[in-house]
Curated annotation (Swiss-Prot):
It catalyses: The enzyme specifically hydrolyzes (1->4)-beta-D-galactosidic linkages in type I arabinogalactans. Its EC number is 3.2.1.89. Has a pH range of 5.5-8.5 with optimum of 7.0; and a temperature optimum of 65 degrees Celsius at pH 6.5. This is Arabinogalactan endo-beta-1,4-galactanase.
Amino acid sequence: ALTYRGVDWSSVVVEERAGVSYKNTNGNAQPLENILAANGVNTVRQRVWVNPADGNYNLDYNIAIAKRAKAAGLGVYIDFHYSDTWADPAHQTMPAGWPSDIDNLSWKLYNYTLDAANKLQNAGIQPTIVSIGNEIRAGLLWPTGRTENWANIARLLHSAAWGIKDSSLSPKPKIMIHLDNGWDWGTQNWWYTNVLKQGTLELSDFDMMGVSFYPFYSSSATLSALKSSLDNMAKTWNKEIAVVETNWPISCPNPRYSFPSDVKNIPFSPEGQTTFITNVANIVSSVSRGVGLFYWEPAWIHNANLGSSCADNTMFSQSGQALSSLSVFQRI
């Protein structure tokens, strides 16, 4: 079994405030954390935004839901976006008021990370994993940390890692770097080779490499390409490896891109979700030091397309009832 069998549940309180009542597969209302735990989930992933306008996904929001997760026996994986909003390959907007020169920005990032980690510890939350940035293939904290300036990226990540290492968190979490397109070895190799050759970010600064792996953004995102890429990553850097975001649709009438060849026979249904997640988990398990799989936001039913061209990638019905696919976490 994988060490980390997880889901991202960041939007749980947003949905509860919108009136969603989550139900288990039998139709009985229960807190989402209990439904997840009963279906084999052992870790929840949570995105942290620095100062979002409405407060959703800020540190206080995350501490509140992390306490619920901990009470349900779940581990917590904190995903720092280092932005006031979404951070991904198309968006890495520096938080409002942060300095843009590299010296002051490095200190700001270190101190922000240190302070957030200490606040988690003081609240009784000891995350098992902390990601320093989210999908940072194109860098982080733009414009200073764009890939045109690898030296800045290396310095920023070193500062973030040491914010965790110097914190009062005990025990210390695994520190992760997270890129998208986990199937693309060329991209992973280009990125890590460039950032590590700067000499500032050391291999000892981090423990895990996380990747996103979605089937609906490129026909090149085959399961076989994922396996090859993760095998190469493990062989080259000897880090723990996890697929930290993935989805499979229960409805996808008008996909924008052709699906990868080796998943085309998988149906768009809860049964298909079970098959796809099992296949991805088997690949991670087959990789040296492959340790985890996280499904992205399976309970965000008011945003069911989850940013894709597929109509619904969640593992809950629109009325909030868990689908049969949620139990896949008992078997990976």
